[in-house]
Amino acid sequence: MAAPKGNRFWEARSSHGRNPKFESPEALWAACCEYFEWVEANPLWEMKAFSYQGEVTQEPIAKMRAMTITGLTLFLDVTLETWRQYRVREDLSEVVTRAEQIIYDQKFSGAADDLLNANIIARDLGLKEQSQFEDVTPDKGDRDKRRSRIKELFNRGTGRDS
């Protein structure tokens, strides 16, 4: 059944849109801390085979779970776009920055200690080894003069001309 024409039921609502997920920086920080604690309490498990006196057994080994922004947003039940908007909100930007720094540090430290795959983490963190090559050869005119002089000296040393 359609609403009657000219109705204004929507004006009866006290606010428009859904209520914010986190109404204060403290609420967002508490939720972020819950995620950090969850990551620590829920490691990934790998089955490793061990051999002792000819008997092979498999044992579960706890492995560090990397914190991620995507994991955090899923835990908080917000989208990545919402997280980006929190980053620019004056009241929440400090919490977002701090959470991102904690995630960065956990990944970097885990990779440095070989608890996480260093190649994957380096790519994720935007780290790369830089090799910079610079052509320090002077302009072509000087290079031609130098080559000519080297050739002249070489030929003089070997007793040949041209």
From Swiss-Prot:
Q: What keywords does the record list, in alphabetical order?
A: DNA-binding, Late protein, Viral genome packaging, Viral release from host cell
In alphabetical order, the GO MF annotations are: DNA binding
Q: Which residues form a coiled coil?
A: none
Biased composition of type Basic and acidic residues is found at 137-162
Q: Where is this region: Helix-turn-helix (HTH)?
A: 7-27
Task: Name the InterPro entries for this protein.
Answer: GP3_package
Entry keyword Protein biosynthesis: no
Q: Which Pfam families match?
A: GP3_package
Location of the region described as Disordered in the Swiss-Prot/TrEMBL record: 132-162
State how it assembles. Answer: Homononamer; forms a ring-like structure through which genomic DNA is translocated into the capsid. Heterodimer with the terminase small subunit gp3; the active complex is probably heterooligomeric. Interacts with the terminase small subunit; the active complex is composed of dimer of terminase large subunits and a nonamer ring of terminase small subunits.
Protein family according to the UniProt entry: Belongs to the P22likevirus small terminase family.
Q: What does the UniProt record say this protein does?
A: The terminase small subunit binds to the packaging initiation site and regulates the ATPase activity of the terminase large subunit. The terminase lies at a unique vertex of the procapsid and is composed of two subunits, a small terminase subunit involved in viral DNA recognition (packaging 'pac' sequence), and a large terminase subunit possessing endonucleolytic and ATPase activities. Both terminase subunits heterooligomerize and are docked on the portal protein to form the packaging machine.
Tell me the protein's name: Terminase, small subunit
State the organism of origin: Enterobacteria phage LP7
Task: Give the source lineage, highest ranks first.
Answer: Viruses, Duplodnaviria, Heunggongvirae, Uroviricota, Caudoviricetes
